[in-house]
From Swiss-Prot:
Protein's cellular compartments: Membrane
Keywords from the UniProt entry: Membrane, Transmembrane, Transmembrane helix
Classification via InterPro entries: Sugar_P_trans_dom, TPT_transporter
Lineage: Eukaryota, Metazoa, Chordata, Craniata, Vertebrata
Stated name of the protein: Solute carrier family 35 member D2-like protein
Database matches in PANTHER family: SOLUTE CARRIER FAMILY 35
Protein species of origin: Sus scrofa (Pig)
Intervals, Cytoplasmic compartment: 1-26, 78-144, 194-204, 263-268, 324-343
Length: 343
């Protein structure tokens, strides 16, 4: 009888140790998923910019089409080799994926088009609006609330974007319109992916596969009707080995980025995924100023870019701190409840 409390306290101690090691592994996986997404999204912007601007490849649509085909091919082979698992097609699959294929298509094409039209610093600073739109989307779809600190840092980022845009000497209206549409679609896509992953019907691979598969024929039809397919076929750079390598990389990176986005959203949240994208954009902003070739320096623009960057850094810090605090309080509540149960 006297040994029972000692046993229960030892058991509780073991449980706490087990929970701590599981939490460490979870944090490591979260950081790994976030890092993988950051590197992937950095590489794809640089490669897409090179293909569309430096090589003047005439069709954003055909780059998008290449990315869809690569995604379907890689996942199909992966499933055949039993490396990945996802459900076979049935008549319920379109209902389970909707509206993600449309958001995916819109997101991809507007992103590529704005990459072509805007210099990298303005492209990245205008992408900050996706955080504002993600907050709206998560509020409406996932019923999330945000602290005063988060709202203020998002406000700082948006003000910085407005200041930078006010003296953008390379202003391109089409580019601005497409990047803002892209921001809205990114936000909606992130929130819907989280919702669909939580329902566990198709899984991350199923979502990736069917998103791309359902949009290949519509994209091909649009490319044919608009004359983009012909422009791509007439392009003179196909004989250039370096261009071919970058075009192939752009197609494969499209799949890797989609996978990294879903992985980061699954292990973290849609908001964390957007933050990581934002930090990556800081690197791209400064690299784009020096190496992009299409950035025109003005002090107002430069100050605006840096206000936005400072806002995104503070924002990232607050969000991660809040996430860790909420997880710690959840863990301590669980332990308290277990302790009460043991007593």
């Amino acid at each position: 009888k006297g040994e029972a409390p000692a046993k229960s306290s030892t058991h509780r101690h073991d449980e706490e140790l087990g929970m701590a090691s599981a939490e460490t592994l979870t944090v490591f996986l979260k950081l790994l998923a976030a890092g993988f997404y950051g590197v992937s999204s950095f590489l794809i912007v640089v490669v897409n910019k090179s293909v569309l601007t430096n090589y003047r490849f005439p069709s954003s649509l055909c780059v998008g089409l290449g990315q869809m085909v690569a995604t379907v091919a890689v996942l199909w082979v992966g499933k055949a080799l039993r490396v990945v698992k996802f459900p076979d097609f049935d008549r319920n699959v379109p209902r389970k994926t909707f509206p993600l294929p449309l958001l995916y298509f819109g997101n991809q094409i507007t992103g590529l088009f704005s990459t072509k039209k805007l210099n990298l610093p303005m492209f990245t600073v205008l992408r900050r609006f996706s955080i504002l739109f993600t907050m709206f989307a998560e509020g409406v779809l996932l019923k999330k609330t945000f602290s005063w600190g988060i709202k203020m840092t998002v406000f700082a980022m948006i003000i910085g974007a407005f200041v930078a845009a006010s003296s953008d000497l390379a202003f391109d209206l089409e580019g601005y319109v497409f990047i803002l549409i892209n921001d809205v679609l990114t936000a909606a896509n992130g929130a819907y992916v989280k919702q669909k992953l939580d329902s566990k019907e198709l899984g991350k691979y199923g979502l990736l596969y069917y998103n791309a598969l359902f949009m290949i024929l519509p994209t091909l039809a649009i490319a044919y009707i608009t004359g983009d397919a012909q422009k791509a076929m007439d392009f003179e750079g196909w004989a250039d080995t370096l261009f071919l390598l970058q075009f192939t990389l752009s197609c494969v990176m499209g799949f890797i980025l989609m996978y990294a986005t879903v992985l980061c959203t699954q292990y973290n949240s849609a908001l964390t995924t957007t933050i990581v994208g934002c930090i990556k954009n800081i690197l791209i902003t400064y690299i784009g100023m020096v190496f992009g070739g299409d950035y025109i320096f003005t002090w107002t623009n430069f100050i605006g870019l840096n206000i936005s960057i400072a806002g995104s850094l503070v924002y990232s810090y607050i969000t991660f701190s809040e996430e860790q605090l909420s997880k710690q309080s959840e863990a301590s509540n669980k332990l308290d409840n277990k302790g009460k149960g043991a007593v």
